[in-house]
UniProtKB/Swiss-Prot annotation:
Sel1-like repeat ranges, renumbered to this chain: 107-143, 147-184, 185-220, 592-623, 624-659
Positions of region (Disordered): 789-818
Signal sequence interval, chain numbering: 1-19
Record-given protein name: ERAD-associated E3 ubiquitin-protein ligase component HRD3
SMART domains in UniProt: SEL1 (SM00671)
GO MF term list: ubiquitin-protein transferase activity
Glycosylated position list: 105, 127, 146, 424, 607, 688, 713
Main subcellular location of this protein, as a coarse class: endoplasmic reticulum
Compositionally biased residues, Acidic residues: 796-810
Residue ranges of the TM segments: 752-772
Source organism of this protein record: Candida glabrata (strain ATCC 2001 / BCRC 20586 / JCM 3761 / NBRC 0622 / NRRL Y-65 / CBS 138) (Yeast)
Length: 833
C-alpha cells in the first residue's frame, strides 16, 4: 500500500511537471522502445554462449514469501537505475510513459505500463499492484473492448494476484466471458475448461464441447495444407511440471503420476563416454571432426586409426550433439541452423572414410545422414526444402548399410511422404510405409498417413481408417487428434460419449501450446532467470486455461511442502489458499499426487477434516502415500476417532499397490501393535479418542522433529542468530506451560516402550542367527529353515531328511546335552510380522 501511495504521488508530481508541455511523449517513447529488447528469453539458443556440457534445467525457487522483501527489491532496482548514468533511460522512459498515461490519458501508454509491471519488460522490476492499477484504468478508458486486456484483468480477479487484491472469481468469470465474446482464444479455453470441470460454474459438457471444437477449428486454420497433411511443425513443448525436475511432488518411489519431463538433453550410450568437443571452422557450438590418419608404419590406407588424443567414439557424440540442437531442450531452444552446419561438416569430412569405419561408426554416421536428409526434406535450417538432396542422402545411407538389417523408421516415412505428395505415387508410398510399420517402432505420422490413404483409396484395402487414425491420435500426433475427434463425433456407430469427444478436442487444443499458451515458455524462462513472481503469473494464466501441468507448477511456486526436518515456509494465507485451489484442480484432472499435497497443506493448517477428505479421494486412486496418511490419522485420532484396527487396515492396503514399501509398512504395523498392547495393559480405551482439528497438540509431533528443532535452536543461540525465530519462539513459550523432558522431545511412554520392544526383538533375532548355527539349533523363520540343515533334506526330498535325521540323531542329542543339558533337539521358530 505504501508503495502504491508513493507511485500515485509521483504520478501527480510528474503530471504537474509535465503541464508545461502540450505534446504527448508516447510517440517518442514508443519509437525508442522498439530498439530495446522487450524480454530476454534464456531458453533462446542465442541468448548465451552455452557450451555442450550444459546441465539440465537448474533453478532456485524460494520457499518463503515476504511482501517487505518484494517491496525492498523493487525499490533497490529503481535505486540502481537512478545511481547509474548508463541506465538513465529507464527512469526517463518510465516518467514519460506516466505523463502520457496520466496527463494525456493515452490508453496505449496505460497498457504498456500494465505490461511492463506485469511481466517486468525492458528490465523494469515486476510490480503487481501498479500493473493492476493501470490495467483497470486502461479497461475503463476503452469501455472494456480490448480482449487481451480483459483476459489479464480476469486473471487478476480470479487469482487476486496472490494477495494483491481480494479474489473475486465471479467477476473474473464475467471478464473471461466478455473477452471470449470479443474473440480471445485463451478466454474461450478458460470457459471451456470451467464448463468441463465444473469449476466456478455449473458443469456443462455440451457447452465445453462446443467451445473446444470452436477453438480447435480456429487452430487448424493457422496451419497451411502442406503443414497439416505432410510435415507438421515441430513444437517445443514446455508443458512440464516444475516439481518433476526434483523427482515429483511426493518424491521417488511414492509418486503415482508419470513424469512430465521429456525434452532433457539426450542421454549418451555408455560406450560414448563424455567428449570435449572442439570448434572447427565457423561451425561453432560443439562441432568436432573425428581425426582420421594413415598408419605411418606401412602407409596402407586400409589401416587408418583414430588419433590417440581423441575419443574413439567421437562420431557418436557428434550425432547426439546435432540431435540436441535439432530438437532443443528445456534450457536451450532449437537451433536448426547450427545442427545443419554440424551435420554438413560431418558429411563433408567423413563420407570418403566410410570404408574404414567399423559397424558402430557406420551406424551413427548413417543416423547423421538421415537427420540431415530429413532437414533437407522439411526445409528446417534451410531457406526452402530440397527434396532431391534429401533423396540423395537417403540413397547414400542405404548404400552404406547395404545388407544390414537396421531399422530406419523415420527415413522410410520421409521417403513415403516424398513419394505420396511430390510424385503422387501411392503404391510407392505404401511400400515405404510398410517397411516403417514392420520395424515395430512406427510413429504417429505413419498411422495418420495410412488412415488418410485408406479413406481416400478404399479399393486398395489398406485397412480401417478409423483404427489407423485412433492409433495416430493415441501417439499424440496433433493432426490425427483433430481428425480422430471429428471422426468420432460424426460416427454414430462408435460408442463414444460427449465427454470422451470433449477430451479429444481438449487434448488437441492444449497440445498446440505455441498458439494457446506461449507464456508457458516465458514462465519457464523467467524461472531460469530467477524471476519467480513473473514466472508465477505466467503459469497462473495457463493454469486458468486448464493446463494440469501449469496448475501444479503455479501451486508449487506458491507453496512448497518443507522437507522432513526443515521449518515450514513463511508465506501469506492468500498464497497458501491459492496453492490448495490449484492442487485440487489438478487432482480433478487426474493428478493423484496433487490431492495428497493439498491434504498435507490442510494437515499443517490443523484442518484435519479437509485433509482426511483429500487423502480419502487420493486413496481411491490407489495412492500409497494417501493410504499411509489415513492410517496415521486413525492411529493418532486426528480429526477422527482413534481406531487402531482401521489404522492397520489402511497400512496393510499399501502393500496391495506398492510392494516396495514392505518394510516401512511392517514397521508401522509392528509399532501399532505394540502401542495397542501397551495401552491395553494400562487399561486405556482405544475408541472415542480424537484430537480436535483446532487443538494444538504435541502428541502428533514426532520425536525426531522435536529433536532436530531443538538442535536448530541451540545452533542459533550459539551463533547469536536469534533475532526473528527465537523472538517468535519465546513469545510462544510464555503462553505454554513448562514441559517435561519427554514432552519436550514429543515422546509418550508407549512410544518409548515401543522403541525398546522393537530393539529387543531385533536383538533376539540377531542372537539366534549368530548362535544357532554353532549350537546346531533348528531355526525357522516363517517356516523356512535357516540353520541346522536343509528342512527338506537333499534336493528337497523329505525321505532324505528322515534318513539324515535317523543317522545323526544320536550325535545331535549328545551335542545338545553337552551344550545345554537338554535331551531333545532345541527348536526355535521366529515369525516375521
Amino acid at each position: 500500500m505504501l508503495l502504491s501511495t508513493y507511485l500515485n504521488w509521483a504520478s501527480v508530481l510528474l503530471t504537474i511537471a509535465g503541464a508545461e508541455s502540450n505534446i504527448d511523449p508516447w510517440d517518442e517513447v514508443s519509437s525508442f522502445l522498439q530498439g530495446k529488447l522487450r524480454k530476454l528469453d534464456v531458453t533462446n539458443p542465442n541468448a548465451y554462449d552455452m557450451n555442450d556440457n550444459e546441465q539440465d534445467a537448474t533453478f532456485y525457487v524460494s520457499m518463503d514469501y515476504h511482501e517487505e522483501e518484494e517491496r525492498s527489491e523493487y525499490e533497490s532496482v529503481w535505486q540502481y537505475y537512478n545511481e547509474n548514468s548508463d541506465q538513465d533511460w529507464h527512469k526517463s522512459v518510465y516518467d514519460k510513459l506516466q505523463v502520457s498515461a496520466d496527463q494525456f490519458n493515452n490508453t496505449e501508454a496505460m497498457y504498456k505500463l500494465s505490461q511492463i509491471n506485469l511481466w517486468g519488460q525492458y528490465g523494469y522490476p515486476h510490480n503487481k499492484s501498479v500493473a493492476f492499477q493501470y490495467l483497470q484504468k486502461f479497461n475503463d478508458m476503452t469501455s472494456y473492448e480490448n480482449s487481451s486486456a480483459l483476459f489479464d484483468l480476469a486473471v487478476a480477479y480470479s487469482t487476486g494476484l496472490f494477495g494483491t487484491l481480494p479474489v473475486d472469481v465471479a467477476r473474473g468469470l464475467l471478464y473471461f466471458q466478455r473477452s471470449a465474446r470479443l474473440g480471445d482464444l485463451k478466454a474461450k479455453q478458460v470457459l471451456a475448461y470451467r464448463y468441463f470441470s465444473g469449476y466456478s460454474v455449473a458443469r456443462d459438457v455440451d457447452k465445453a464441447l462446443l467451445l473446444y471444437k470452436e477453438i480447435a477449428e480456429e487452430i487448424k486454420k493457422k496451419y497451411s495444407e502442406e503443414q497439416w497433411n505432410m510435415v507438421f511443425p515441430y513444437i517445443e513443448s514446455y508443458i512440464v511440471r516444475i516439481p518433476d525436475f526434483d523427482e515429483g511432488l511426493l518424491g521417488k518411489g511414492l509418486s503415482t503420476v508419470p513424469q512430465s519431463v521429456r525434452r532433457k538433453k539426450t542421454t549418451r550410450p555408455p560406450f560414448a563416454g563424455s567428449s570435449n568437443l572442439k570448434p572447427i571452422g565457423d561451425v561453432g557450438y560443439g562441432e568436432v571432426v573425428m581425426q582420421f590418419k594413415f598408419n605411418a608404419g606401412n602407409g596402407n590406407p586400409g589401416s587408418f586409426v583414430i588419433s590417440d588424443s581423441e575419443h574413439e567414439d567421437r562420431l557418436v557424440e557428434l550425432f547426439y550433439t546435432a540431435w540436441d540442437l535439432y530438437k532443443g531442450t528445456y534450457t536451450r531452444g532449437r537451433d536448426c541452423d547450427k545442427a545443419k552446419r554440424l551435420l554438413l561438416q560431418v558429411y563433408k569430412t567423413y563420407d570418403a572414410e566410410v570404408k574404414y569405419m567399423d559397424n558402430l561408426q557406420k551406424f551413427f554416421y548413417v543416423k547423421s545422414l538421415d537427420l540431415l536428409a530429413h532437414m533437407y526434406f522439411t526445409g528446417e535450417g534451410f531457406e526452402r526444402p530440397n527434396v532431391q538432396a534429401a533423396l540423395d542422402l537417403f540413397d547414400r545411407s542405404e548404400k552404406i548399410l547395404e545388407g544390414a538389417e537396421i531399422s530406419r523408421t523415420a527415413s522410410e516415412v520421409d521417403k513415403g511422404l516424398i513419394s505420396q505428395y511430390y510424385f503422387n505415387n501411392t503404391l510407392g508410398a505404401l511400400k515405404h510405409y510398410k517397411k516403417a510399420k514392420e520395424s515395430g517402432n512406427a510413429h504417429g505420422i505413419l498411422f495418420y498417413q495410412l488412415g488418410k490413404l485408406s479413406e481416400k483409396n478404399p479399393e486398395l484395402k489398406i485397412g480401417d481408417p478409423y483404427l489407423y487414425m485412433q492409433e495416430a491420435s493415441s501417439q499424440q500426433y496433433l493432426p490425427a487428434q483433430y481428425e480422430f475427434a471429428k471422426m468420432v463425433e460424426s460416427n454414430e456407430l462408435r460408442k463414444y460419449s460427449v465427454e470422451d469427444i470433449t477430451r479429444l478436442y481438449k487434448a488437441f487444443v492444449e497440445e498446440n501450446e505455441n498458439i494457446m499458451a506461449p507464456h508457458l515458455r516465458l514462465g519457464f524462462s523467467e524461472l531460469l532467470g530467477g524471476s519467480s513472481e513473473v514466472s508465477l503469473y505466467a503459469y497462473a494464466q495457463a493454469a486458468e486455461q486448464g493446463y494440469e501441468a501449469a496448475q501444479i507448477s503455479a501451486a508449487y511456486l506458491l507453496y512448497q511442502l518443507p522437507y522432513k526436518f526443515d521449518d515450514p515456509p513463511e508465506t501469506t494465507i492468500e498464497r497458501k489458499t491459492m496453492a490448495i485451489s490449484y492442487y485440487t484442480r489438478a487432482f480433478k484432472q487426474g493428478n493423484t499426487d496433487a490431492a495428497v499435497v493439498a491434504g498435507d497443506i490442510y494437515f499443517q493448517m490443523k484442518n484435519y477434516t479437509k485433509a482426511l477428505s483429500l487423502y480419502q479421494s487420493a486413496a481411491l486412486k490407489f495412492s500409497a502415500q494417501a493410504l499411509w496418511n489415513i492410517g496415521y490419522m486413525y492411529e493418532h485420532g486426528l480429526g477422527v476417532e482413534k481406531d487402531f484396527h482401521l489404522a492397520k487396515r489402511f497400512y496393510d492396503q499399501i502393500l496391495e499397490h506398492n510392494q516396495k514399501l514392505y518394510f516401512a509398512v511392517k514397521a508401522s504395523v509392528m509399532k501399532l501393535q505394540l502401542k495397542s498392547w501397551f495401552m491395553w495393559l494400562n487399561g486405556k480405551e482405544l475408541d472415542n479418542i480424537s484430537i480436535d482439528q483446532e487443538q494444538e497438540s504435541t502428541v502428533v509431533r514426532p520425536f525426531f522433529d522435536r529433536l532436530v528443532q531443538l538442535l536448530k535452536n541451540l545452533s542459533r543461540e550459539t551463533r547469536g542468530d536469534n533475532k526473528k525465530k527465537n523472538q517468535h519462539r519465546i513469545l510462544k513459550e510464555k503462553k505454554t506451560p513448562s514441559q517435561g523432558i519427554m514432552e519436550r522431545f514429543g515422546l509418550q511412554t508407549e512410544d518409548l516402550l515401543t522403541m525398546v520392544c522393537v530393539l529387543i526383538i531385533f536383538a533376539i533375532s540377531m542372537f539366534f542367527r549368530t548362535v544357532a548355527p554353532r549350537g546346531q539349533w533348528n531355526v525357522r523363520i516363517n517356516g523356512v529353515n535357516i540353520a541346522g540343515g536343509n528342512a527338506l533334506g537333499e534336493e528337497g526330498n523329505p525321505e532324505n531328511e528322515n534318513e539324515e535325521d535317523d543317522e545323526n540323531d544320536d550325535e545331535g542329542r549328545a551335542r545338545a546335552r553337552n551344550n545345554f543339558g537338554f535331551g531333545n533337539n532345541f527348536d526355535v521358530q521366529v515369525f516375521a510380522i
